[in-house]
Amino acid sequence: MSLTNEQIIEAIASKSVSEIVELITAMEEKFGVSAAAAAVAVAAGPAEAAEEKTEFDVILADAGANKVAVIKAVRGATGLGLKEAKDLVESAPAALKEGISKGEAEALKKELEEAGAKVEIK
């Protein structure tokens, strides 16, 4: 009689941690493989996902009614000149800053929203 995958999973789930370690060791010996290589590959996946979440882009979605205040806020945040900041604000939606920390992105969003802009963090 052949066991289904579900039956195998249930049997493993009912084992203690030490019994599972013994099972893994026995499987490594029987099949001549190492579970360490698989663990390294699995560990690399979540690290990349976490790395992506540490950098954020601040997007100016709309300048709103008070463009002058938004232009001043953009100049202060980006260090752009008056003409460059004005062009950026008028070309909304546009990326203001890319690859910044969450705290910096939130602070920039708050500053621009207080000036009347609509801002997105991606």
From Swiss-Prot:
In terms of HAMAP family, this protein maps to: Ribosomal_bL12
Q: Domain of life of the organism in this record? A: Bacteria
The protein's matches in InterPro entries, at most eight in alphabetical order, are given as:
Ribosomal_bL12, Ribosomal_bL12_C, Ribosomal_bL12_C/ClpS-like, Ribosomal_bL12_oligo, Ribosomal_bL12_oligo_N_sf
Q: What is the species listed in this Swiss-Prot or TrEMBL entry?
A: Glaesserella parasuis serovar 5 (strain SH0165) (Haemophilus parasuis)
Any idea which GO molecular function terms this record carries? mRNA binding; structural constituent of ribosome
- What is this protein's record name? Large ribosomal subunit protein bL12
A single GO cellular-component term from the record reads: cytosolic large ribosomal subunit
Q: Which CDD domains match?
A: Ribosomal_L7_L12
GO annotations under biological process?
A: translation
Subunit details: Homodimer. Part of the ribosomal stalk of the 50S ribosomal subunit. Forms a multimeric L10(L12)X complex, where L10 forms an elongated spine to which 2 to 4 L12 dimers bind in a sequential fashion. Binds GTP-bound translation factors.
Report the sequence similarity comment from the record.
Answer: Belongs to the bacterial ribosomal protein bL12 family.
Its function, per the record, reads: Forms part of the ribosomal stalk which helps the ribosome interact with GTP-bound translation factors. Is thus essential for accurate translation.
**Entry keyword set:** Ribonucleoprotein, Ribosomal protein
For whether the record's keyword set contains Ribosomal protein, the answer is: yes
